[in-house]
Amino acid sequence: MSSHKSTTKSSSSGSSMSLILGFSKSMEKGNYNFSKENKKNRSFGVLYAMIKGNTFPRILTIISLLIEFCQLSSFGFKQQYPWGGDAGYYLKRIMSPVSHPSNLVGYNGFTIFFWIVIGLLLLGFFNIWYVAYQFYRGKIANIWIIRTLRWFVSTTVAVLFIPIISLLLIGLDCDYSQGGILKTFSNDNIYCFKGANLSIAIVSIILIIVFSIVGFTSSATYYEYDTNVKSRFSKPHARFDVYILFVKLILALLNSLVDFSPWTTSIVYFILSITLVFGSIIILPYNNQRLNQVKSGFYTTVFWVSFMTLVTMGINDETTATTCYITIVGAFFAFPIGYFSNRFYYNWLSSKIDQLKLPTSSSTNDFNEITKNEKSKTGDSKEKESSSPSKVTWGKQPITLGSKRQIIFPFFQNKFVMSFFVEIMVRKLLRSSNGSNGDDGISSNSNESIEHANNLYQCGLQYFPNSDLLWMAYCNFLFTVRKDRHIGYAALEKLRRMKPSFDVRFFIYQRDKEREQIMDSDLRGPEHTGKIQDFVSYMEFKKLYYGAKRHHVKCLTYIKKFWGLLLHETVDLHRLSDLSGRIATTENKANESYERLLALNPNSVRVLRDYSQFLEEVVKDTESSYKLQKKAEAIEDIMSKSQTTDFKTIDIKNLDNSDTELDQVLKQESNAIQLAKIDADIERSGSKSGSSKSKDDSSESSSSSKGRRGKYKEFQQSNAINKLSWLMIGTTACCIIFLIVMLIVLRDLSVKHTHSYQGIISITDCASEAVSIAINLNTMQAISISAGSVAFPFEAAEAMITQYRKQNDRSLIIMKNIHDAIYWGEGDPTSYVGDNLSKLKSINGFDVFDIGSTIFSFEEFNRSSTLVDNKEMIDIYSTPSVNMTILVSPPGTNSTNYITVTQTYNAWKAGNSFYESALIANKMSVQDIKDRAVFDPDFKFIILNAPSNIPEMYMKIQQVYIKSLIDDINTTLDTMLYVWVAIFCFLIILGAVLFRPIVTKISREKIRTLVLFSLAPKDVVFKLSSKKIKMTSLDSGSERDNLFDTTDDDAADGIDNHEHLQVDERKKNDDIIDDGSIVNRSINFGSHRRPLMNSTNVLASTTTINRGTISNRLNEDHDKVPLIENSISNNNKGYGWDGKSKRNLNKKSLRSVLRRLHWSYVLAIFLLFGFITMGLWVTYSVVHDNTQSGYVLGKSCSRSLDSRIINYYIAELYTFDNDANENEALEAVLQLQSNHQSLPYLEDVRPLMEGSYGCWMLNKSNCITSDSIYYNDVSIGLDWLVDQYTKHSVSLVNTDPSLLSTSPELGWMQAIGSDVVFQGLDTATFTYFQYYLSQKDWATKVLTSVLAISCVLLLVIHLLLFRPFMNHLRIQHIHTLALLRLAPDDIRFMEVSDKVIDED
């Protein structure tokens, strides 16, 4: 009655995605056979590796949903929309970076961020290609590669799709009206398809296409369909997710490329938001209904934002924030509207189930009968229910695949009904019958509810027979809920024949893979009892299993080879030692692999049997072997009780519990050993390896298992290797500690260096303040002499002198504080500079405080500098070394003559005397200055000493200060060098004293053990060398060996490098042995680890071989195992020891190998020495370059001081007291010119010197304007200004005193020869200071990086070279001693004399 629906609705749910997913059919080729999927299903193999078991856990799903809501909402607050007021401004500022984080940085930041993201994307794409290529080669990629691939897909597609696409679109967002300039960075004039952005544009176009394909493909398959998985939110399909991704792509494209048309973007945003709301409500993507309601609430809020965006566009008023507030308030109402709309729709759709009507007839062909008892209890009630044809009956119906019977459901006859409605109704049936409203898990549903759901699916398939989405949901229901795998696989085959869409075909592929894992039950164990649940763990398990088998067979083969070498007439101990190491290596690897396998899945029968055989044949631990064997048999008994491969949870007990069925079986046997102990032993021994089961490379150390280590405790009597190991650890630790100490010392030295730069400037500024005080006093004297005339009244002079007196008061305080700071050893003299440099530091971000307002006490100084402790600094401050000129009072009171004398002061008292005299002179009244300044001792003390003696004193202090700094640095570096040489010598002595005896002891123990084996009777050697190798489950599943990348360190073996452990090759080798012609030598030597058997068990398990069957012995080269002579007469001399004659032993080659241990330690020491010496050399070169910078900075400071001294002498020319000294003035000019010409012309100083710097005045109002006659002198640059300054100074010195007042040079000096020159030179000094400070910071970073890298390198060398070497040595040494278990009892405890060991 509803067959007409099949044509109109056959693919109602799948057709909507055909355009997006149609391309995917070309990706899938071939059938779904696992054996061919590595060649024909590469695309699905990659997707399966990415998706299976990798969907977000519940909490991450909720977080991703919140992130998606924020990203979609942010499209309504783009810059093109006129959101008004402060609220609109902040909304656009906050919400826009959610989808465009690069908006927060400039073009350079965008470029860096862009290429970082591109690099990560390319790594992800390369990862995809690599996994696909490995599938193409028929191998499985590295487990960590697959894990990173899964992380890449989870984060980039599910969370970061919008930010990544938006970032790629920034480089394509062009404004063609301005010639194709990038809109986002229009101020930088970056062209889209020119210059630096061309590569960005091309890469963006390519990656948008590739990333979109990857995103859509993975989104279509990125979901958890199994409702029994409690850790994740399940959903039946992901087609709505594909549409959401499509919406995100459209919105990102429009808002990046069409943002010039806000009406277009806002309308599209509104339409897409509506579709998201209705889609989330109608499709109900998640099985968890509450999550569906939350999702609809979010999308309704996004719809509200899009609607208000349209309203804002219509109002177009950026002055009011009304729409912003309405949007924010309305969002709180939009969410519950969407939330409850979704809930109402779900309840309405679920209520339609009551219309379902079933036929009343029942059938005996029900496939899934419960039990006869259940039928007898429930039969009557069900017959009553089925008696009424008008009532919905849920009795047993004939269950056939895609039932042809007419199940009446009028609701499905409506045109608007879609096939996925069936699956939504089934959710309600399963959930309501169990009384659950929020959980999506249905594993505890009653059989009745499952039958109800099955009937509903049967009805849906009747109305929608060609809906691949409905068939997929039904298959999933049969597998996960009804657990009816037979009908499920039949339904899967029918779905396969329907040629379904891409996502459904991938579902089929997943089911095929899971079926293969279930069929591989001897690896997995019973269902739900193993731990192999996801694809990655399953692949890791299989890879480990085949690796364990390889190492197992190799170990047995090397044992045969070991005994075969003893058949030589001359026994080469080197080859025996080499084979013993190979035996130890392969045994250790096999043991570790088996333990990791049991940690992954303790109930795998095949692993239990193989490990049991390994323990019996190799380790000779019969007790543990028996326990594992009994456990495997018990598991097989339980598995054999099932009639099918469907091992349900109710049928299998937990095999690890003490009261399980398995334990009950074992307890019935009187001689059985309880499994709890072996499980505990396995858990204990494999705890470390099992906890890191995701690692693909097993550790080379036996320390990963305490249980295994205990098996060889009896062979660890010698602590020689432990001592050697601690010696290597101590050597590396000593070197690393030295580097860390050196790093701390150098960083402390860097801080001192920074403060020393500050101190150099401070000392010179102290002298500059002294000269400035003298200049002001000279000016005050000149003013007082001129005062009293009509043109210059006394009151005007008084005001001017008061102003100069205030300047001197501040200069005196600054000078006193600097003088005390240097003397007391101020640790951080950053603030102790003059006003000019203090302002420059403050402008450039230095933390400075005012030192010109008060004099600091002794306690207020940070007295942490060690430079003042230098001997020369102490001498200059404590011994008389500064010549000061003092005025001697004349003998007569009216005499105008005066004389001066020179007295010697120390620097501390000279500075204090200058300060005290200046303080007195500065307090003189105008009249006193006019009348008595010429004869005042304090006034003249300042005038006579300020231009020469005081600057000379402070320059001497500066030079000693710099020299003290260099001496301190050199002393520190020399100390580090001496300490390192001492450490190196100590390590060499330590090696000579301790290392050599330890190595000698190890060598002797190894030779002693091997000599014992050379004494084994030849009949025992024949038997052990001829033992046939056979594994109980070797051939099982071996055809899949080629699925795994089995490459390891076997390729490094130099002997018989042709073993790949193929089945045919193993059989061939075994056949050779059966013929009795050759000792099996086809197995490759390789790797390194663990021990073996005792002689009793070996002899008991060895097959006896008649001597007459031994083939003729052939001569072979030294590197091959020799053939055994076929017929050896009893009268002939037999190979192997006959117990009488002397054994021929070759010890030379072994001794040469053991001597290499000495050179290994020497190489280790020189490696450490090389890295540390390299770090020291870089440190010395960088620090040495920086030490010379103090002299350059001091010379720049001296230039500023010279300019002030020249200005002082020029001022004296018109003070009328005959104190002018032309010679000293010319010397000051020469000194200024010399310093100026000898300073390096740094790139940072070039703008200031050449005029491009602009005005350097601290107060910009004092800058020389272009209309000034002196503008050209200043605008050309400081270099020209200094040159003019020196020329004018020389000219003034040689000018007649009577013409000074009218000299143009004097006017030039008064206009720009003071503050303009002073501030320019101070700015140059600060520029030098900043440059060398940056160089020091760079040097500190270099030193830190070099030393830190050296520390890391030393640690890496120890971990990658020294530690593996010691572990390798320890394993081989211990296992060589453990080989004594192979020796017969009559030689096992023999004593070998030292003479035999020492002789060659």
Swiss-Prot record:
InterPro entries (UniProt xref): HAT, Tiny_macrocysts_regulators, TPR-like_helical_dom_sf
Pfam family, one: TPR_TmcB
Subcellular location: Membrane
Domain of life per record: Eukaryota
Residue numbers spanned by region Disordered: 367-393, 683-712
Key words of the record: Membrane, Transmembrane, Transmembrane helix
Gene Ontology biological process terms from the UniProt entry: cell-cell fusion; RNA processing
Deleted gene: phenotype: Null cells have increased numbers of peripheral cells during sexual development. Indistinguishable from the wild-type cells with respect to the cAMP response.
Signal peptide: none
Primary localization: membrane
Compositional bias annotation for Basic and acidic residues: 369-386
Gene Ontology cellular-component annotations: membrane
TM region positions: 59-79, 112-132, 152-172, 196-216, 240-260, 266-286, 296-316, 320-340, 726-746, 975-995, 1162-1182, 1342-1362
Recorded topology in the membrane: Multi-pass membrane protein
Keyword Magnesium annotated: no
Protein name as catalogued: Tiny macrocysts protein C
Gene from which this protein is expressed: tmcC
